[in-house]
Amino acid sequence: SAKVVITEDANADKKVDWQDGAIAYRSIMNNPQGWEKVKDITAYRIAMNFGSQAQNPFLMTLDGIKKINLHTDGLGQGVLLKGYGSEGHDSGHLNYADIGKRIGGVEDFKTLIEKAKKYGAHLGIHVNASETYPESKYFNENILRKNPDGSYSYGWNWLDQGINIDAAYDLAHGRLARWEDLKNKLGEGLDFIYVDVWGNGQSGDNGAWATHVLAKEINKQGWRFAIEWGHGGEYDSTFHHWAADLTYGGYTNKGINSAITRFIRNHQKDAWVGDYRSYGGAADYPLLGGYSMKDFEGWQGRSDYNGYVTNLFAHDVMTKYFQHFTVSKWENGTPVTMTDNGSTYKWTPEMKVELVDAAGNKVVVTRKSNDVNSPQYRERTVTLNGRVIQDGSAYLTPWNWDANGKKLPTDKEKMYYFNTQAGATTWTLPSDWANSKVYLYKLTDQGKTEEKELTVKDGKITLDLLANQPYVLYRSKQTNPEMSWSEGMHIYDQGFNSGTLKHWTISGDASKAEIVKSQGANDMLRIQGNKEKVSLTQKLTGLKPNTKYAVYVGVDNR
């Protein structure tokens, strides 16, 4: 069957055009399962386990969730577990219920799922439905794909040699049952399934119908569907890795660059071309942003924690803010000439985008210049109900939702401040912030720090703060949530994330033991400059009799 919708002027611009049709189309279109969560998942990243090394056990990932919760003052998170099963990433494929024992097994995974809820962290797993490996119990002759000459069609070979499968055969011979096995093993709480490489045809037909059937199998278990390619699975997917991971893969596959599609679905998915200037075209400062994904837990060797946080506030907070609204009006400018990636071409940039929410609040995003050679081409002004909340490099943006999208009580409503440049900026506060005083906090991995009481004068405040440093503003004084580190790990604060050594018994010169940051800003214990033995001890807890345990201690001895 088909649906048709007829509309009048839907965005009050006194004309009827494609934009009114796009607004009306939302009333009859499909909505990908889980789209409502997308706007609140601000801190996406990958936690990587590979080659039997168990670099990020499940409960260590939980500590990372707590750390980001503090550093972002409670923004929602999305953690993709690459290597949740078998011996890690790209091992044991097709046996989805084979939870990796070295990283904690089923028990620790379920603990992670349950305890992550408190922090608004949405967990997903990386799977493959296109190839299989010899260690998988589903590796058998019937499912393997062959070339016309009868030889096997090979896939990845960086560990065991993977062999591509026949996806159509798999559909008819047990794929759904494997999803059900995983659901039965983990129970409720897993948020999304990321299907790697699907769409490149290595397993045969990965077209629209086959992709929709795969997505329905996953949705049936209560999970969101996510995919690798920027254009893949548009009907069902809410997250596209290559669209979000801007430095991964080539510029030709970075996301959907259709203005019409983005107009309709900007609030529903992270599939759009983000800001990466060298790619040109839509990637040269899209007004609505686009998810920019970084990591600090091993994917692509990335371990720069501070870089992750800086990127999140520079790109992703405003991208997610816009997703709390729907696009209502889109104005293009005049074509500009761009030269990149070996070609010169004309590109028509969007100059103004208007968005609204169900309560009638209106956001207007305006590019400062139509001249591609002007620095202001890559700057925007953003207003909320006529009040400026971003001006070029700086924003002071209200955030009135918790990590799961629920409205915050008035005394917890806040504004995030971030500026890529140092210097003073002046802001008009909303009328309901007409206090004589407001409270500013510097955000760090210890949460809200360095409280400053600011005087509101004529409804305005002036901020003169550090560049590339996130801050948060409140009406009243705030405290940080209490964190219990390394739950279930038999030792308290295995990663020294608490910022203190008070949980350790120190013998010798305690002044020589301190927590320091690595080059990637990860916390480490350092004992240095001591003239006598310095030791730190802590009693292991929760150990069971007649049970073997392994202790891993990472040491940099120089």
Feature roles, as predicted:
Residues 496, 534-557:
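Extra-cytoplasmic beta-strand recognition segments
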Residues 478-510:
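Extracellular carbohydrate-recognition regions
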Residues 429-432, 529, 542, 555-557:
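Non-cytosolic beta-sheet module surface loops
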Residues 1-15, 33-59, 129, 136, ...:
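Active-site-proximal substrate-binding groove within the catalytic cores of carbohydrate-active enzymes
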Residues 497-531:
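Extracellular glycan-recognition surfaces and repeat-rich motifs
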Residues 85-107, 139-169:
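Aromatic- and acidic-residue-enriched carbohydrate-binding clefts of CAZyme catalytic domains
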Residues 416, 461-462, 524-528, 537-542:
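Beta-strand-rich interaction surfaces with strong enrichment in secreted/lumenal proteins
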